[in-house]
């Protein structure tokens, strides 16, 4: 009876180990957890949602070790923020391995919102199609976008080959 009812509502995030993550990052993660990922412009009035600013704040203010730890958080939105934050850090060296890890990280999908459209996708689809812009089958990159992530052509090809193995 009771155990079954309680276990059906269990969230893995309840027992997440926050050691090594500062309180202000934890507080922002807890708020960001249910907001999905936003391109920055949503809705009819093309407003920038607070979730976009929150995501940017976490990526900018979390340390490399905090972001690495957050790639293990049991929520797709937070994992995506952590992966993207590491990819965007110029000093982070293991980007290819990290992205390959993200490609195989399929347990938690995310909700991505852009313009008036929201859609569910895997973390890898968000990273490859809307952060890295390396798949020619994906939406075009924004005007003026350059690959500023330090990935060589062979690294991008390796990432793309692994990404294309995942059923969409």
How does the language model describe each region?
Residues 6-80, 84-89, 96-168:
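Extended repeat-based scaffolds of very large eukaryotic assembly and lipid-transport proteins
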């Amino acid at each position: 009876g009771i155990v079954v009812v309680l276990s059906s509502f269990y969230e893995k995030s309840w027992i997440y180990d926050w050691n090594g993550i500062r309180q202000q990052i934890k507080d922002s993660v807890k708020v960001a957890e249910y907001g999905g990922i936003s391109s920055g412009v949503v809705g009819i009035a093309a407003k920038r949602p607070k979730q976009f600013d929150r995501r940017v704040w976490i990526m900018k203010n979390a340390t490399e070790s905090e972001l690495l730890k957050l790639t293990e958080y049991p929520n797709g939105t937070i994992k995506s923020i952590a992966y993207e934050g590491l990819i965007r850090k110029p000093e982070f060296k293991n980007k290819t391995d990290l992205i390959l890890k993200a490609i195989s990280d399929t347990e938690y999908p995310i909700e991505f919102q852009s313009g008036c459209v929201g859609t569910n996708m895997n973390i890898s689809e968000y990273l490859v199609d809307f952060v890295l812009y390396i798949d020619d089958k994906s939406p075009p990159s924004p005007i003026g976008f350059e690959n500023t992530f330090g990935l060589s052509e062979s690294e991008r090809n390796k990432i793309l080959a692994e990404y294309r193995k995942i059923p969409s």
